[in-house]
Amino acid sequence: MNKIAIYPGTFDPITNGHVDLVERALNIFDEIVVAVSTAYGKNTLFDIRIREQMIKEVFKDNQRVKVVSFQGLLVDTAVKHNACAIVRGLRAVSDFDYEFQMSSVNNKLNSDIQTIFLTPSEKFSCISSTLVRAVAIHNYKRVDEFVPECVFREIKLKYSKE
């Protein structure tokens, strides 16, 4: 039986830090389901179809990574995809409070699904989608080192029109 984990997020956009986390999680699990959230209540840079498409392109050569979109409860999506764990990244202590609360709620909703926290590789510890969006607003050309090439192309398309 394959050990499957789900890695949820808005991924607006996916960063090299997210990619690193997926690659490292594959050392623990047989398959990672990257679950792209509809981002209820958030204004996103990219709509969900584009975010999902970019992530599929990033992992197109990795048969062990599946990309899906979802809305609703994460634990329901995890069950749907036979995941035994939720993978979450912790960049800083400030992430812990929120992630701990979410982990506790998910555990109450389905105690069979565990939450696994991974810290980023040092070179990715300061990268976030929020940072990428903030830099891109001022100078999209400066975000190329923070995101995969296909994501940079989408950012360039979006901001070179403005």
From Swiss-Prot:
Keyword DNA-binding in annotation: no
Lineage: Bacteria, Pseudomonadati, Pseudomonadota, Gammaproteobacteria, Thiotrichales
EC number: 2.7.7.3
Catalysed reactions, semicolon-separated: (R)-4'-phosphopantetheine + ATP + H(+) = 3'-dephospho-CoA + diphosphate
A Gene Ontology cellular-component term: cytoplasm
Binding-site list for substrate: T10, K42, L74, R88
NCBIfam families, alphabetized: coaD_prev_kdtB, cyt_tran_rel
Binding positions for ATP per the UniProt entry: T10, F11, H18, G89, L90, R91, E99, F124, S125, C126, I127, S128, S129, T130
Localization: Cytoplasm
Recorded family membership: Belongs to the bacterial CoaD family.
HAMAP family to which the protein is assigned, alphabetical: PPAT_bact
One Pfam family this sequence matches: CTP_transf_like
Keyword Membrane carried by entry: no
Pathway note: Cofactor biosynthesis; coenzyme A biosynthesis; CoA from (R)-pantothenate: step 4/5
Designated name of the protein: Phosphopantetheine adenylyltransferase
Originating gene: coaD
Taxonomic superkingdom: Bacteria
Its job: Reversibly transfers an adenylyl group from ATP to 4'-phosphopantetheine, yielding dephospho-CoA (dPCoA) and pyrophosphate.
Catalytic EC class: transferase
SUPFAM superfamilies cross-referenced by the UniProt entry: Nucleotidylyl transferase
GO molecular function: ATP binding; pantetheine-phosphate adenylyltransferase activity
Alphabetic keyword roster: ATP-binding, Coenzyme A biosynthesis, Cytoplasm, Magnesium, Nucleotide-binding, Nucleotidyltransferase, Transferase
Site entry (Transition state stabilizer), positions: H18
InterPro entries, sorted: Cyt_trans-like, PPAT, Rossmann-like_a/b/a_fold
Complex formation: Homohexamer.
Cofactor (UniProt): Mg(2+)
